[in-house]
């Protein structure tokens, strides 16, 4: 399993639109679902900072994710540009293979 964690700072008033686009039936998931190695995404909202969101994307392998980016580069960039207006910033926090799960 390969995961990518993104952090977003959403503009006030854009929360609903952001959640729709980045949620389980949103445009990003629809794009990712074109690849058989995509396993799903989670959208998380920071309760301490309600304008901060995180997405976790799950892929079978890193090479599958990289291959997807190469094959769908223009569609990916087009989506990214079309939803820039919803956020102040976005950044990739980490990517990698989880060593183990920790349950608290």
Task: For each feature predicted by the language model, list its residue ranges.
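Short, well-ordered beta-strand segments in beta-rich or mixed alpha/beta enzyme
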Residues: 2-9, 40-71
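Short acidic/polar alpha-helix capping motifs at helix-coil junctions
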Residues: 4-8, 17-18, 93
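Short coil/turn residues that cap or connect secondary-structure elements
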Residues: 10, 14, 30-33
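Short, conserved charged micro-motifs
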Residues: 13-19, 64-67
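An amphipathic, aromatic/His-enriched active-site/gating alpha helix that lines ligand/cofactor pockets
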Residues: 23-40, 58-93
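A general secondary-structure junction signal
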Residues: 45, 92-97
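Short, low-order "capping/linker" segments at domain edges
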Residues: 96-104
């Amino acid at each position: 399993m390969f995961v990518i964690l993104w952090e977003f700072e959403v503009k006030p008033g854009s929360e609903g639109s952001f959640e729709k686009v980045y949620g389980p039936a949103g445009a990003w998931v629809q794009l990712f679902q074109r690849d058989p190695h995509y396993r799903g995404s989670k959208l998380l909202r920071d309760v301490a900072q309600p304008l901060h969101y995180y997405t976790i994307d799950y892929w079978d392998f890193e090479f599958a994710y990289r291959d997807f980016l190469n094959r769908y580069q223009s569609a990916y960039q087009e989506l990214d540009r079309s939803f820039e207006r919803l956020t102040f910033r976005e950044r990739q926090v980490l990517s990698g293979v989880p060593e183990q799960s920790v349950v608290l």
